[in-house]
UniProtKB/Swiss-Prot annotation:
RNA-binding protein which may be involved in spermatogenesis. May be required for sperm development, possibly by participating in pre-mRNA splicing in the testis. It comes from Mus musculus. This is RNA-binding motif protein, Y chromosome, family 9. One of its GO terms (molecular function) is RNA binding. Residues 82-226, 279-358 are annotated as: Disordered. Residues 8-86 form the RRM domain. Its main location: nucleus.
Amino acid sequence: MAETDQPGKIFIGGLNIKTRQKTLQEIFGRFGPVARVILMRDRETKKSRGFAFLTFRRPADAKNAVKEMNGVILDGKRIKVKQARRPSSLESGSKKRPPSFSRTRGASRILKCGRGGRSRARSGPSCEGNLGGDRYTPNFNVSSSGRHFAVKRNPSSKRDGPPSKRSATSAQTRSNTGLRGREPHRREISRNMPRGEPASSRRDEYPLPRDYGQSSNDRKYESTSRGYCDYGNYHSREESASKVFSDHAGYLGGRDRDFSEYLSGNSYRDTYRSYGRFHEAPSARGGNNRYDDYSNSQDGYGGRGEPYISNRSNIYSSDYERSGRQEVLPPPIDREYFDREGRQERGHSPKDGLYSASRESYSSNTKIWGIPWRSWRKQI
């Protein structure tokens, strides 16, 4: 702390921290009346800082005290006593401040931020610090206004900071190529196995034990045979009967190995070929031509009707015993002939009148489980 420049004021330095203000007043009071004694203390600890200022009422007393007391040992320490003076660089009545620049000049020199250039500000202390791994470190150069600071690049932060976007991309590419051969075992297995394969295809590739020795038509027959067992539950029977019969016809065509004895002479395939080609147009109700043309050939229909029904019943009974089903329902071919008779009465086919006599004799002689066709129709 600088005091006002007065002729009777002296500076006393090099004091012991145990020296008190009252002791100084008593010692220097021998040279003349003392007007004021100031012992400089620390603001926080309140301890002596080792120097003091003393003011005499007369300037001549101050000069005598400087001559007599300079270099004297006081409380074990040699003290320095001299005339207190204000520094020549400062004006009277103003406080000591560091040299300053103008605003424009300070701002132009301080606010410089670049990779190669540095700030040239020469005023005020600088405070450097790393901002948590960033590549730029603030360099606070306080000017006279205290508002400007410069930011310069820290060379160590370039190495310690996060990599740039280009370097991160190249590092990621190198890591992908390097780790391609060291992927986990789980991903290798999943890459070899097919993705998104439905459960049905896997079930077809690995059939159950009950499917051994059967072709794809066998599985088709098992699925369609369920529709055949539910045959008696439908009220509209024409389309369902034709669909089920066509499925069974395809099934018998694929059973060459297991049912070779039925295909020898009286099978469905030979009987079907003896019926001839199709000559009748499709009916108005969407009937199947294959079933309508069974009645167009009188020789094939009348001559081979009974063996056909006996063979068909034997085939269906053996098929159901093979698939493990206990219930046996009437074959769809008999139902088709029965529907053909009903169509004749309603007049759907133009050629049905030619063979009405043969169909009547056939339907009267044919029985299912000991019940004539007409009584069976009434029961349904």
